UniProtKB/Swiss-Prot annotation:
SMART domains: AAA (SM00382). It comes from the Eukaryota. It comes from Aspergillus aculeatus (strain ATCC 16872 / CBS 172.66 / WB 5094). Glycans are attached at residues 289, 501, 675, 738, 1324. Residues 739-748 have a biased composition (Basic and acidic residues). It is a multi-pass membrane protein. One of its GO terms (molecular function) is ATP hydrolysis activity. Keywords: ATP-binding, Cell membrane, Glycoprotein, Membrane, Nucleotide-binding, Repeat, Transmembrane, Transmembrane helix, Transport. Residues 725-748 are annotated as: Disordered. SUPFAM superfamilies: P-loop containing nucleoside triphosphate hydrolases. Residues 108-365, 761-1003 form the ABC transporter domain. This is ABC-type transporter vrcC. The chain crosses the membrane at residues 476-496, 510-530, 564-584, 683-703, 1105-1125, 1142-1162, 1191-1211, 1230-1250, 1266-1286, 1290-1310, 1378-1398. Belongs to the ABC transporter superfamily. ABCG family. PDR (TC 3.A.1.205) subfamily.
Length: 1413
């Protein structure tokens, strides 16, 4: 009874406290108000009023109340919806398999066997329990904070509540009640009413913040908008409001960016994600660690905004937080504490701490409530009160058992029962909720649809966004249009003014075939674009903003003007080839393989090929009802003058003896088996194809989603001991947490491995200006400071204050903008070796995903440690770093990608470890090392940094959201405000007293005893959104005695080192003063090349999807062409078919380079963002290694391509008469080998200078078109205009086609097909042999029967060498052609390296030293 009374008393106290806080919040905003808001329309607010989100006086609370008033007064407005939740007996589980090991080219087949076993139901899957027996209620208007370390199940719980259960399963006995709505209806009919905001920020990087948020607001705009404004004004106003609340109004016209495209800062990007989710106006919101990357002030402001939503709109909010500030914790009503998936507390936030105190635990001084509750999950962090050592719980099961037996749990169960009684499933509330939702939807939208806008409105909105994206980044479209214009001019000049005679028959067919071919291949770039935006579209679908198919339609429509323009300007559109199936489309058009030569087993491909019908109609349109003058008569010459017309015939298929012309209909009927009656029928068939395929595509976009992440499961190489240990998989990545925490103290304190440092790094009057548009913006404004050995300096400031920029400038990692100021190491300017002698742990944990932890550390050690250090010593050093960082349990685990592989903490430790493995001789920079980590992990990271500090390491570290206890562990603070201006630089002091005294002395309010100084100082300078200060803290600092002391100390440091050795050149922090210590890179070139080449080969071996897709691209097209032309006969058309088999093989060039380019871009991004700035290895090593590994794999693929293409076609039989089967087979393989090597090096040549694979694809496709046009297949050298002969000679495909065709068909006879014989009568009293003897002697050819006296059957080609001469090829030139291909290959390599150096290697910018006053 006493416990019940205590709990009830605590609840009453909480209610009173919450009411008081709301009143204080209202008073705080009201004091800032200058206008009364009673009855005002927020959409018609006066400029500068408290309701104007653009003005400085904006009052968020006043706006919310005004908006609520307008909404309630409007009779047509939809009723406000609320959505609470009750869950009981909640169990969630997943399945792990035995195949969770690293896949490689060699072992990927085991995965196929496992899939087969799974399909047969014989695979044993391990059931993994994620959540166990959770219960609780969160009523409408309440806020729940979910606490627990990584791996405890926080993310899984939030996903379960939001209905996103992909990858795991909810037990059938579990109960979830959404205020009368079942979980099934919520996931389908009301998706978007309960949303899950993930920790990862996914946006269109080139879209501005304003456009990104306007789109989100517009997509959820209700049918009837209160306030008398249109939908555009409504969406714009809501966007401006949420941006003002979150403090990102200044980023409205800045692109969002991502890890590789510079845009808004990381903290601002996180707030963009928050704003986007808020604009969905979902009544149930689940936020997963959404304060990651935010400073304390903005984290508190975020929670304050959620509190306003809950209090005024009745929103239900569930949030998982790491390192939650105390002020943020107070905004929540309830707290759920999870310990390895078990619930160890659920209840009021003000009762949670007392629950554990009564259990026998103690809360250290200045520890926040949230940190105290989370510390219950770590036996190292939790503190037991004296006398309670033997009775407190220790394991997760013991904590859960204690909770199940508590009075608090009984009250929770009672609350769940009352809730379920009040809100019965599918009861009265469901009808009200559906009515409110329906009132918000467009009139034509389905009642059961989760979307607000109608389908047409969704398409229209996506069209608007597509146009904005096009404006932001038109480079791909413009390059495509320019390429098509140039291509049009080239093609027009080649086929200009075709004469109406039989000599142009092949050219007309080739031209139409080429038009169909290139337009059929126009989907390649679109596929790349669709995959790039897939994650964003799926996120918006989860928010119920629009159908994925609506985005698909809008992308089609957006492309239409450019496709129409392309059709007007040119016959073709050249884009990368992306699918092997396209080979069937352009092989079976009827031109490359005529209908009569299509084998019976493959004839059906032509029937389902829309390009076949298009080509037939185009050819009919070109030849129907036209007579073409004959230009070559057989026989002809001096011996055949004055003959009767029946004794001669036109040497063209479809000719009739005695006619001097050839009818077009007869020609296409004889040559292609085309019927003129099919012309309009084919157009109808094409339209039907368009409708059916378009419908399939739209349905697929709505139902087919990306492969879901398995969670952060540790993956080891196959055969590693960890796979056999039977440890359960961890779906959230926390399984190794306690293992790392259980290391002995002696192991943790072993710091002999870290080298002590002596160098002092100082900077003075550092400014950084960057040009944005036509204006210059100052990012850093006269920043001063120093870092000494054995000190840990914190760099803090509001998000966007320039903290990361300052680190980049100090670490010599900026390539843009203008830097001024002085940066010295022991009084001397930084030399070329500075970057490799410093460690820089970036905020983004970027690592090679296929490497293991140990390999990543060894790679850094081998290439970044001094060259004189023995290799064995470097490897041993890595082992010591692994021990130091407590990474032994996962040292051989694969890094993976974020979401799969190492968890956040492990990645952060690896990032620091990579820098430590380099043995930085000067200092260590760290950018947000605790961002996204829970309080215990953050403490462990700071513990590590303090160990490094004690051993003489100089450390400069930016940090967000430090607790008072974390903040106290730093020695000094460099504090920046917006604009990169210094607010304070100096010692922090015991209990932060020195820092506090400075601000109080200069006009700041006193710091409360229980307050966190790190949060308090942000409030003092007005850094939090909505807070203001009348004190110019930058000027205050510049006029303070502390600033004068800093300047004096900087001068003394410089003078001191100058006096020590004024003449010698000093490279501080090095052990040996030799020339090697001044080198840009620690390792010599050959060592760099060896190590990088080994790593790249390992990476490719461990990328089986990439390698096997490369194999498919080489094998399937070769097999397809080979068996489509299986054992091709040596007829005239057969020889042409064999030539086109080479042409079709060469077309795969585009597809091969398109596969390489995106892969290279990924590798280049990692190199340029992390490895190049740290001077790990040179750009030449990077380029040569990536080119070399592709050459190796393409060499292997050439063998497969050769075998799958050469022998099925039957070209080897052509070498039998000359007994050169083996020689010519080897020659053919060598030519195919050079083709693949050329493809690989050409891809690197194209992408070396360009950022986007799409732009490189456009350029590569254009050059590929030129190669195909001028290779001698579609137009022989004799048919080319004289101006274009040089293109025939510089095209590498010329020598490939010439060489491959000569090797394939030389030195054998030709046997004409029946339709290829020319039929005519000899003159009277002569045989056919006698009649044609003079002509055959002159022109060649042979007769079917020389003794015939009527109906002579003459074949104009007798041997394949004559055919080769006609197309400009000769077997004698084979070795020359092979040598020329190597010239092209080496030219590509040299050009790729030169282009990369010219366009992407940063030029060192020396800072401008400001003149001394």
């Amino acid at each position: 009874m006493a416990d019940d009374h205590k709990v009830e008393s605590g609840l009453n106290t909480h209610v009173e406290k919450r009411a008081e806080e709301v009143h204080q919040l209202a008073r705080q905003f009201t004091e800032q108000s200058t206008f009364s808001t009673a009855g005002q329309n927020p959409f018609a607010a006066e400029p500068g009023s408290v309701l104007d989100p653009i003005g400085n006086n904006f009052d968020a609370l006043a706006w919310c109340k005004a908006m609520l008033h307008v909404h309630t007064e409007d009779e047509k407005a939809h009723p406000l919806r609320t959505l609470g939740i009750a869950f009981n007996n909640l169990y969630v589980h997943g399945f792990g398999s035995d195949t969770d090991y690293q896949k490689s080219v060699g072992n990927v087949w085991f995965e196929a066997l496992a899939l087969a076993r799974k399909a047969l139901g014989t695979q044993n899957q391990r059931r993994i329990q994620i959540l166990q027996n959770l219960e609780g209620t969160v009523e409408a208007g309440e806020m729940l904070v979910v606490l627990g370390p990584p791996g405890s199940g926080c993310s899984t719980f939030l996903k379960t509540i939001a209905g996103e259960t992909d990858g795991f399963h909810i037990d059938k006995e579990s109960s979830i009640n959404y205020q009368g709505v079942s979980a099934k209806k919520m996931a389908h009919e009301f998706r978007g009413e309960a949303i899950y905001a993930a920790e990862v920020d996914v946006h269109f990087p080139k879209l501005t913040v304003g456009d990104t948020l306007y789109f989100a607001a517009r997509a959820r705009a209700p049918r009837h908008i209160p306030g008398g404004v249109d939908v555009a004004q409504y969406a714009s106003h809501k966007r401006d409001v949420i941006m003002a609340i979150l403090g990102i109004s200044h980023t409205k016209n800045t692109i969002v960016g991502n890890d590789f495209i510079r845009g808004v800062s990381g903290g601002e990007r996180k707030r963009v994600s928050i704003a986007e989710a808020c604009l969905s106006s979902a009544p149930l919101q689940c936020w997963d660690n959404s304060t990651r990357g935010l400073d304390s002030a903005n984290a508190i402001e975020f929670c304050k905004a959620l509190r306003m939503q809950a209090d005024i709109n009745g929103a239900t909010v569930c949030v998982s937080l790491y390192q939650a500030p105390q002020a943020a914790y107070h905004y929540f009503d309830k707290v759920l504490v999870l310990y390895e998936g078990r619930q160890i507390f659920f209840g009021r936030t003000d009762a949670a701490k007392q629950y554990f105190l009564d259990m026998g635990f103690a809360c250290p001084e200045r520890q926040t409530d949230a940190d105290f509750l989370t510390s219950m999950t770590s036996h190292i962090e939790r503190v037991v009160q004296p006398g309670y050592e033997g009775c407190v719980p220790r394991t997760p099961d013991e904590f859960a058992a204690r909770w199940r037996g508590s009075h608090q749990r009984a009250r929770v169960l009672q609350d769940v029962e009352n809730y379920n009684t009040k809100f019965t499933l599918n009861g009265e509330f469901l009808g009200k909720f559906r009515h409110s939702r329906r009132a918000q939807q467009a009139r034509v939208q389905r009642v059961s649809s989760p979307y607000t806008l109608s389908y047409a409105q969704q398409v229209n909105l996506c069209l608007w966004r597509g146009y904005q994206r096009l404006k932001a980044d038109p480079s791909v479209t413009i390059s495509s249009l320019i390429g098509n214009v140039i291509t049009a001019l080239v093609i027009a000049s080649i086929f200009y003014n075709l004469q109406p005679n039989t000599s142009t028959f092949f050219q007309r067919g080739a031209l139409l075939f080429f038009a169909c071919l290139i337009n059929a291949l126009g989907c390649g770039l679109e596929m790349l674009t669709l995959y790039a935006q897939r994650g964003i579209v799926e996120k918006h679908a989860r928010y119920a903003l629009y159908h994925p198919s609506a985005e698909a339609i809008s992308s089609m429509i957006m492309d239409l003007p450019f496709k129409v323009l392309n059709a007007i300007l040119s016959l073709v559109q050249a884009l990368p080839f992306c699918a092997v199936v396209l080979l069937g489309l352009y092989s079976y058009t009827g031109f490359a393989i005529p209908t009569g030569y299509m084998l019976g087993w493959a004839r059906w491909i032509a029937y389902i090929n829309p390009i076949n019908y298009g080509f037939e109609s185009l050819l009919i349109n070109e030849f129907h009802d036209r007579d073409f003058q004959c230009v070559a008569i057989v026989p002809s010459g001096p011996s055949y003058m004055d003959l009767h017309s029946r004794n001669q015939v036109c040497s063209t298929v479809g000719s009739v003896p005695g006619q001097a012309f050839v009818n077009g209909d007869a020609y296409i009927q004889s040559a292609y088996d085309y019927n003129v009656s099919h012309k309009w029928r084919n157009i109808g068939i094409i339209l039907a194809f368009m409708v059916v395929l378009g419908a399939i595509y739209l349905v697929a976009t709505d139902f087919i989603t990306e492969k879901k992440s398995k969670g952060e499961i540790l993956v080891f190489p196959r055969g590693h001991g960890a796979l056999k240990s039977g440890k359960p998989d961890d779906f959230e990545g926390g399984s190794d947490r306690n293992a790392s925490q259980e290391k002995s103290k002696s192991d943790r304190d072993d710091l002999t491995v870290i080298e002590s440092q002596t160098a002092i790094f100082q900077w003075q009057d550092v400014c950084f200006d960057i040009k944005i548009g036509k204006e210059s913006r100052r990012i850093l404004d006269h920043v001063d400071g120093w870092v000494k050995p054995g000190t840990l300096t914190a760099l803090m400031g509001v998000s966007g204050a320039g903290k990361t920029t300052l680190l980049d400038v100090l670490a010599t990692r900026t390539t843009l903008g203008v830097i001024s100021g002085e940066m010295l190491v022991d009084g001397k300017p930084r030399d070329e070796s500075f970057q490799r002698k410093t460690g820089y742990a970036q905020q983004q944990d970027l690592h090679l995903s296929t490497a293991t932890v140990r390999e990543a550390l060894e790679f850094s050690a081998l290439l970044r440690q001094p060259a004189h250090v023995p290799r064995r010593e470097k490897i041993n050093y890595v082992t010591e770093v692994i021990k130091l960082l407590d990474m032994a349990d996962y040292a051989d685990a694969v890094i993976g990608v974020p979401g799969e592989g190492l968890n956040v903490e492990q990645r952060k430790r690896l990032t620091i470890g990579v820098e430590l493995a380099a043995r930085p001789a000067l200092l260590l920079f760290l950018d947000e090392p605790t961002s996204g980590l829970d309080s215990q992990t953050s403490w462990a990271i700071l513990d590590l940094l303090n160990k490094l500090r004690k051993n003489g390491q100089a450390i400069l570290c930016t940090i967000h959201q430090p607790s008072a206890m974390l903040f106290q562990r730093f020695d000094r603070l460099l504090f920046l405000q917006a604009g990169g201006q210094t607010v304070y630089f100096g010692d922090i002091g015991q209990n932060s007293q020195i820092l506090i005294d400075y601000f109080v002395r200069n006009g700041g309010p006193p710091c409360p005893p229980a307050a966190n100084p790190a949060e308090w100082m942000l409030d003092v300078i007005g850094a939090a959104p909505g807070s203001h200060t009348d004190i110019d803290w930058f000027e205050t600092w510049r006029n303070s005695p502390e600033y004068a002391q800093v300047q004096a100390h900087l001068s003394s440091l410089k003078l001191e080192h100058a006096q020590q050795n004024p003449l010698a050149r000093v490279s501080p922090g090095t052990e040996r003063e030799d020339r090697a210590s001044y080198r840009e890179f620690a390792a010599p070139f050959c060592a760099q090349l060896r190590e990088v080449q080994i790593r790249v080969f390992q990476q490719f071996w461990r990328s089986p999807i990439y390698i096997y897709s490369k194999a498919i691209l080489c094998v399937l097209p070769a097999l397809f062409v080979g068996f489509s032309l299986f054992n091709t006969p040596n007829t005239i058309q057969g020889l042409q078919n064999q030539m086109f088999s080479i042409f079709l093989l060469l077309i795969q060039f585009g597809q091969l380079i398109q596969q390489i380019m995106p892969h290279f871009v990924t590798q280049r991004a990692l190199y340029e963002v992390r490895e190049r700035p740290s001077k790990t290895y040179s750009w030449t090593v990077f380029m040569l290694s990536n080119i070399g590994v592709e050459l190796f794999w393409n060499s292997l693929m050439s063998i497969l391509m050769f075998l799958c293409w050469y022998y099925p076609i039957g070209m080897y039989r052509n070498a039998e008469p000359s007994d050169t089967v083996h020689l010519r087979g080897a020659q053919m393989w060598l030519l195919i080998w050079t083709f693949l090597l050329f493809s690989s090096t050409f891809a690197h040549f194209m992408i070396a200078a360009l950022d986007a694979a799409e732009n490189a694809g456009n350029l590569g496709s254009f050059l590929l078109l030129l190669c195909l046009l001028f290779c001698g297949v579609l137009a022989t050298p004799a048919q080319l205009p004289g101006f274009w002969i040089f293109m025939y000679r510089v095209s590498p495909f010329t020598y490939l086609v010439s060489g491959m065709l000569a090797v394939g068909i030389a030195d054998t006879t030709v046997t004409c097909a029946d339709n290829e014989y020319l039929r005519f009568d000899p003159v009277n009293d002569t045989t056919c042999g006698q009649y044609l003897a003079p002509y055959i002697a002159q022109a060649g050819g042979y007769l079917h029967d020389e003794t015939a006296t009527a109906a002579c059957r003459f074949c104009p080609v007798a041997d394949t060498n004559a055919y080769l001469r006609g197309v400009g090829a000769s077997y004698a030139d084979v070795w020359r052609n092979f040598g020329l291909m190597w010239v092209f290959i080496f030219t590509n390599i040299v050009a790729a390296c030169l282009l990369y150096w010219w366009t992407r290697v940063p030029r060192v910018k020396k800072p401008v030293v400001a003149p001394q006053a």
